[in-house]
Amino acid sequence: REVGANTVRLAHYQHSPYFYDACDRAGLVVWAEIPFISVMNPAPGAHENCRSQMKELIVQNYNHPSICFWGISNEITIGGERPGLLDNLRDLNALAHEMDKTRMTTIAHVSMVPMENDMHHITDVLSYNHYFGWYGGELENNEQWLDKFHALHPDRPLGISEYGAEGIVSYHSDTPKCKDYTEEYQAVYHEHLAKVIDERPWLWATHVWNMFDFGCDARDEGGVKGRNNKGLMTLDRKIRK
């Protein structure tokens, strides 16, 4: 509420009923999804596991009015596109619609997915995870990419499922620049993206990554091990960046 948010995209796993209850009370629009991420396991049992998790996600949370979108995967081609992926995604999309005819389906693409791709035509709406101005490229690439995609696919509902930059509260600079991990660059980044988003009302939704810093064992960035510092607040929820 304090940041003016009206929607939440949940991370790629099952969440506590407490959080869904809180979103119901707050009137937030929720995107809930299964942990089908990064790369597809081609084993038949793996897809059955995905189907099982989709069924459980919907059955357990069907009655939460805050949930408006079921997500079928996140950055599933970051490890390469495997044979059978499109069929698996289509099957998960059909399963979600079979179990719940009232809600839309969505997908979060990794930035490298081409603008012309069959995955764009599976779910009801689609979004991209873009980090231009952080992991690569320039800040201005955000609006350039969005406008080009919209020109190519004016009838496809496009959103941003992730965007962000890391800021460590003890790092500061009078001349902030990309990858310096300062609060100042994080502010420059988000001020730019806020303007980009505001000027494009055709974006169906935008979701910042992330509301809070969070633990991640594999990470070692900015001199801080085991933590992703993209949060708008610190890990302990005490400091607003």
Indicate where each model-derived feature is located.
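Extended substrate-binding grooves/exosites of carbohydrate-active enzymes
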Residues: 1-241
